[in-house]
Regions:
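N-terminal active-site beta-alpha-beta segment that forms phosphate/nucleotide-binding
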Residues: 1-112
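Charged helix-capping and loop-helix junction motifs
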Residues: 61, 130-136
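Surface-exposed, charge/polar-rich loops and edge strands
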Residues: 11-15, 111-115, 125-128, 138-179
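A residue-level signal for conserved active-site and pocket-lining positions in enzyme catalytic cores
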Residues: 9, 46, 70, 117, ...
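Anionic-ligand binding patches
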Residues: 84, 118, 122-124
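Short beta-strand segments
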Residues: 47-49, 118-119, 150-152
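Flexible, active-site-proximal loop/turn residues at the rims of small-molecule/cofactor binding pockets
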Residues: 50, 122, 178
Length: 179
């Protein structure tokens, strides 16, 4: 079921008109920047978005301009992930077509991260999410004590039964897509 929901939702996200996506991305980024959790955070962990996802470029730029420390994920086999300080000069394309920092990046300890901006494909009403199937964020969030937030399009909202290992996102910001 998760596989089908993931596939259908990604297809719908890719169908969003560019004009709608640009508007949605700007509004969601602005909303996130206004959150107390963001304003109070010294260190923000986010991700380098795929084209069909809510763009993180504006968020990263704004956070850096505000003097925040920004980190992005580096993944390893068996679903292990760690965050590395954002530096555009050390980004490399992975086998999944995703940009990630290389080994030269400075690791950021989980205890130093105040807010994690969590990616995902499908979200249900209690904040549980379906990602891309690697379990990276569910494993990482298991012991994370800071705040979590996601930014999504309304077409990503669907009800499903979470698994016992799934970790809920504390706050999900939604842009209501009208086509």
């Amino acid at each position: 079921m998760k596989k089908t929901l993931r596939k259908e939702t990604i297809a719908a996200m890719k169908e969003l008109p560019q004009s709608v996506k640009i508007q949605a991305d700007e509004e969601l980024t602005q909303h996130l920047l206004e959150l107390p959790a963001f304003q109070e955070a010294k260190t923000l962990a986010t991700y380098l978005s795929f084209d069909h996802e809510v763009s993180t470029a504006g968020l990263i730029q704004a956070a850096l301009q505000l003097g925040k420390r920004v980190c992005v994920p580096r993944t390893y086999p068996q679903g292990r992930m760690e965050f590395v300080e954002y530096d555009p000069d050390i980004l490399e394309k992975t086998r999944f077509g995703l940009l990630e920092p290389n080994e030269k990046g400075k690791l950021v300890d989980q205890s130093e991260i105040d807010l994690i901006h969590v990616p995902g494909v499908v979200f249900q009403s209690k904040g549980y999410r379906i990602g891309y199937g690697g379990g990276y964020y569910d494993r990482y969030l298991e012991d994370f004590t800071g705040k979590t937030v996601s930014t999504i399009y309304s077409i990503q909202q669907k009800e499903f039964q979470p698994d016992t290992f799934d970790q809920a996102v504390q706050e999900v910001l939604v842009y209501e897509v009208t086509l």
